[in-house]
């Protein structure tokens, strides 16, 4: 692995737009020239007095490779420099040499040692031209890529950039909508135990057949025993039917008797009510002194 040291503009020019976030830390990888004991070239001369002064620890930055047209840069980029190695390629070869990824990466990385080899000093990395970055792959359902990405995700690839979009489904039956602000968590990955489990509940076999009932004893319908049994059964059935008829007749007779008794009692109540009303009328017609004397007796 290469060592890290302070940034030097003479040996390692500023990175292109794809690597600009690294400018905040002001640290870059050491070039190959320092690994062999050679000293890096001194910084470029300071700016004229008319420009703003810079500190002792700062270096002037040459933006001429970025301001020139892209045609010379493309011509320089066509001739690779075999003397320098891409530090990203070495990094990936050291870290993942024993664990090759089954699926090739979909992203293109910028090489710092191949571009502009003719114009750079022999002991330093040349300034690379701005390279076009490959667009991110489109969104695909998680179920389609889950089987292909499972081995790569298990091996662990920290530098792989995966763009997950939150998928929000509506329960009303309408089509789902993609939302990046509402949901930020990636879709879940099924566990190996769930994937290997057999769906026994979904594909249940037919129920077990019940045990066969005990076979009935074969009876000869022409035998005397069978005839006697049938006669006994018929007699018992006739007796039960006769008893049911007798109970019905007794119930009907009792209902008739109770109905007649109810009518007789109703007539008696009416007669007593008439006698009571007659007596009340008689008592109302008697004089009060007679009633008072009758009360003392």
Swiss-Prot record:
Positions of modified residues (Phosphothreonine): 180, 189
GO cellular component terms given for this protein: C/EBP complex; CHOP-C/EBP complex; chromatin; condensed chromosome, centromeric region; cytoplasm; nuclear matrix; nucleoplasm; nucleus
Keyword Cytoplasm: yes
Residue numbers of Phosphoserine PTMs: 105, 185, 240, 277
Subcellular location: Nucleus; Cytoplasm
Chain segments carrying region Required for Lys-134 sumoylation: 1-22
Gene Ontology molecular function, alphabetical: chromatin binding; chromatin DNA binding; DNA binding; DNA-binding transcription activator activity, RNA polymerase II-specific; DNA-binding transcription factor activity, RNA polymerase II-specific; DNA-binding transcription factor binding; DNA-binding transcription repressor activity, RNA polymerase II-specific; histone acetyltransferase binding
Cross-link (Glycyl lysine isopeptide (Lys-Gly) (interchain with G-Cter in SUMO2)): 103, 134, 145, 212, 214, 284
Top-level taxon: Eukaryota
PTM (free text): Phosphorylated at Thr-189 by MAPK and CDK2, serves to prime phosphorylation at Thr-180 and Ser-185 by GSK3B and acquire DNA-binding as well as transactivation activities, required to induce adipogenesis. MAPK and CDK2 act sequentially to maintain Thr-189 in the primed phosphorylated state during mitotical cloning expansion and thereby progression of terminal differentiation. Phosphorylation at Ser-105 enhances transactivation activity. Phosphorylation at Ser-277 in response to calcium increases transactivation activity. Phosphorylated at Thr-189 by RPS6KA1.
Domain bZIP: 223-286
Keywords, comma-separated and alphabetical: Acetylation, Activator, Cytoplasm, Differentiation, DNA-binding, Glycoprotein, Isopeptide bond, Methylation, Nucleus, Phosphoprotein, Transcription, Transcription regulation, Ubl conjugation
Residue positions the entry lists as glycosylated: 181-182
Modified residues (N6-acetyllysine): 39, 99, 102-103
Region (Disordered): 172-201
UniProt-annotated stretches for the region Leucine-zipper: 249-256
Organs and tissues of expression: Liver and lung.
Family of the protein in this entry: Belongs to the bZIP family. C/EBP subfamily.
Function: Important transcription factor regulating the expression of genes involved in immune and inflammatory responses. Also plays a significant role in adipogenesis, as well as in the gluconeogenic pathway, liver regeneration, and hematopoiesis. The consensus recognition site is 5'-T[TG]NNGNAA[TG]-3'. Its functional capacity is governed by protein interactions and post-translational protein modifications. During early embryogenesis, plays essential and redundant roles with CEBPA.
Protein name per its UniProtKB record: CCAAT/enhancer-binding protein beta
Organism: Rattus norvegicus (Rat)
